[in-house]
C-alpha cells in the first residue's frame, strides 16, 4: 500500500486503496458510514460540515452510480460541487490530468474525486497535490475502487453482522480485470473473513498473487455450497472480443446466478453486484430483484460511505 494515504500522525490524508489500510481506519469509516446511514433513514437532510469547501468530481471515464453518489454525498455535507467532464474540457486540447488538478487547486478546490482508466493514475495525481488537498480514488484501471469496497463491506455488515470471522464469501466472474474485486479482497482480509472463495473461468482469474489464501475454483455449483454471501462481478463484454469468453450464453450457463443455483448457497445468502448488471448473463432477473438481493442496498449505502470518507478527509 502507498504510505501517502496517511499523514505522520496516522490520519487519513487521501483514500487511494484499501490495500494495507489499517483495520482501525477501515472500521472507523464503516462505523461512521453506518451512523450516517441510520440517521438518514426516513429523511434526507443536509449538513454544513463542508460548507464553503469545494469538491470536484474529476472523471476521465464514464460513470453513473459512483459519480452521482459522490455528488449527492458532497452536497449533503454542504460542499460546493464541481463536475468535470473530460469530453468537454481542456484535456481534449492536450492538457494533462496533473495540470487540470493544479488549475482547479488554484481556484480553491480542496477535494478531488478521481476516476481514471490507467492503473496508478490517482496516486500519481496525489503526489502532485498541495498541502490540505485530498484525493479520493473513484476507480483507476483495474487496480482499486476503495469506496466500492467500503460500501460492499457496509452492506455485508448490514446483512450478516459485524463479525466476519465465520463468513464464507464467494467472488464470482471476471476477477482479473476487476478493480472492485481487488478492493473487496483487501477489505475482506483486513476484516478477517472466515473463508474467501473465488470462482470464474481460468482466463478471467488473476495470476499476480492477489488470490493468495483464497479458495480458488472453476466449478460454480461446488463453490456455492454453504456460502453466506455472493459477490457477482460484471462481465466486461470487451473480454469476449479478446477471446477470453466464448459467448455470453456459455458464460451464463457456467457462471450465471439463477434461483436454482442460489438454493445451493447458505440459507439467506446475500447477493451483491457492483453494477451495472448484465441481466441474463451474470444474474437472472428473479435473483437480481429477489428477496436476497442487496444490489439497491449497496447503492443506498454508497452515499453514506462517501459522506463518511469526505467528512473524514475534509471535515
Curated annotation (Swiss-Prot):
Q: Which UniProt keywords apply?
A: Pyrimidine biosynthesis, Transferase
Q: Which domain of life is it from?
A: Bacteria
**Per its record, what are the GO molecular function terms?**
amino acid binding; aspartate carbamoyltransferase activity
Spell out the reaction equation it catalyses. carbamoyl phosphate + L-aspartate = N-carbamoyl-L-aspartate + phosphate + H(+)
Q: Name one GO biological process term.
A: amino acid metabolic process
- Where, in this chain's numbering, is carbamoyl phosphate bound? 65-66, 115, 145, 148, 275-276
- Which top EC class is given? transferase
Give binding positions for L-aspartate: 93, 179, 234
Known EC number: 2.1.3.2
Question: What GO cellular component entries does it have?
Answer: cytosol
Q: Give, as in the UniProt entry, the pathway in which the protein acts.
A: Pyrimidine metabolism; UMP biosynthesis via de novo pathway; (S)-dihydroorotate from bicarbonate: step 2/3
Family, similarity comment:
Belongs to the aspartate/ornithine carbamoyltransferase superfamily. ATCase family.
Subunit note: Heterododecamer (2C3:3R2) of six catalytic PyrB chains organized as two trimers (C3), and six regulatory PyrI chains organized as three dimers (R2).
Function summary: Catalyzes the condensation of carbamoyl phosphate and aspartate to form carbamoyl aspartate and inorganic phosphate, the committed step in the de novo pyrimidine nucleotide biosynthesis pathway.
PANTHER family, alphabetized: ASPARTATE CARBAMOYLTRANSFERASE, ORNITHINE CARBAMOYLTRANSFERASE, MITOCHONDRIAL
Per its record, how is this protein called by name? Aspartate carbamoyltransferase catalytic subunit
The record lists the organism as Xanthomonas euvesicatoria pv. vesicatoria (strain 85-10)
Amino acid at each position: 500500500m502507498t504510505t501517502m494515504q496517511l499523514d505522520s500522525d496516522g490520519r487519513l490524508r487521501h483514500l487511494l486503496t484499501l490495500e494495507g489500510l489499517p483495520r482501525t481506519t477501515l472500521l472507523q469509516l464503516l462505523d461512521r458510514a453506518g451512523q450516517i446511514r441510520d440517521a438518514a433513514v426516513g429523511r434526507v437532510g443536509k449538513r454544513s460540515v463542508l460548507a464553503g469547501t469545494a469538491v470536484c468530481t474529476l472523471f476521465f471515464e464514464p460513470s453513473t452510480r459512483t459519480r452521482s453518489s459522490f455528488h449527492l454525498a458532497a452536497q449533503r455535507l454542504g460542499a460546493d460541487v464541481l463536475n468535470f467532464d473530460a469530453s468537454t474540457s481542456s484535456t481534449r486540447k492536450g492538457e494533462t490530468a496533473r495540470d487540470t488538478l493544479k488549475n482547479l487547486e488554484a481556484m480553491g478546490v480542496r477535494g478531488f474525486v478521481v476516476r481514471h482508466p490507467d492503473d496508478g493514475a490517482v496516486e500519481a495525481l496525489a503526489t502532485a497535490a498541495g498541502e490540505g488537498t485530498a484525493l479520493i480514488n473513484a476507480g483507476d484501471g483495474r487496480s482499486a475502487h476503495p469506496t466500492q469496497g467500503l460500501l460492499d463491506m457496509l452492506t455485508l455488515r448490514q446483512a450478516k453482522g459485524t463479525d466476519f470471522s465465520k463468513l464464507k464469501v464467494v467472488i464470482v466472474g471476471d476477477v482479473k480485470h476487476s478493480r472492485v474485486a481487488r478492493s473487496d479482497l483487501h477489505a475482506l482480509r483486513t476484516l478477517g473473513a472466515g473463508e474467501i472463495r473465488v470462482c470464474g473461468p481460468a482466463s478471467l482469474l488473476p495470476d499476480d498473487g492477489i488470490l493468495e489464501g483464497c479458495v480458488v475454483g472453476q466449478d460454480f455449483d461446488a463453490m456455492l455450497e454453504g456460502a453466506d454471501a455472493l459477490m457477482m462481478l460484471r462481465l466486461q463484454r470487451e473480454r469476449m472480443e479478446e477471446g477470453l469468453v466464448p459467448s455470453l450464453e456459455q458464460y451464463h450457463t457456467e457462471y450465471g446466478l439463477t434461483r436454482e443455483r442460489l438454493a445451493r448457497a447458505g440459507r439467506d445468502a446475500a447477493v451483491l453486484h457492483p453494477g451495472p448488471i448484465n441481466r441474463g448473463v451474470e444474474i437472472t432477473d428473479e435473483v437480481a430483484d429477489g428477496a436476497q438481493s442487496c444490489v439497491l442496498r449497496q447503492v443506498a449505502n454508497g452515499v453514506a460511505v462517501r459522506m463518511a470518507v469526505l467528512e473524514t478527509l475534509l471535515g
